[in-house]
Amino acid sequence: RISDWSSDVCSSDLANLIYRNAFMRHDEERRSKYLEDLSNGDVKINAGKMYLYDIISKYKNKWDVEADETLEALWDAQEVPKDYNDILVVRDGSGSMTTSAFGTSVSVLDIADALTIYTTQHNKSEYYKDKFITFSSKPEIVDLSTCNMLRDKLSVLDEYDDWSTTNVESVFNLILDTSVKNKVDAKDLPS
């Protein structure tokens, strides 16, 4: 438990995740200055000791509020992968995905959402960047390119939760039809 809110503990990655609201309550002036400096690029936030789904889970537990600057900064501070060139994500948003993962408050859907957003935003393919396919009875290609913030992307993903039966054949047909329609070369098809 933290009792000295004036210390530099706010630079710790896990402390930023767990105590972000408490920092604001106990030392609003310093926390506001830190968040302002963070958005201006004057300081960095540590994010190396957490999983992507930790950030997603914290966000999804608080839909009733504005964007969370700390969670956005922690997401943006994640390491950029080196070779995401031709990945097309198929996201399962079905009811079975709401199951708890590892016996924690994190759901399997939180993990799927984290991987979906991270992979799509770092994909270098002109065909698949910022796009994913819904894994449902009527799959769709969803474009996240107009979403600037993590919260916005999560909101779009939430709209595509689908409790219907998943259909692998329909997903493959959608990929094939879209590739033919857009005259995608075989070498550019997703892996």
Residue ranges and their predicted role:
Residues 2-5, 9:
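Single conserved hydrophobic/aromatic residue that forms the stacking wall/gate
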Residues 17-191:
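Acidic, glycine-rich A-domain
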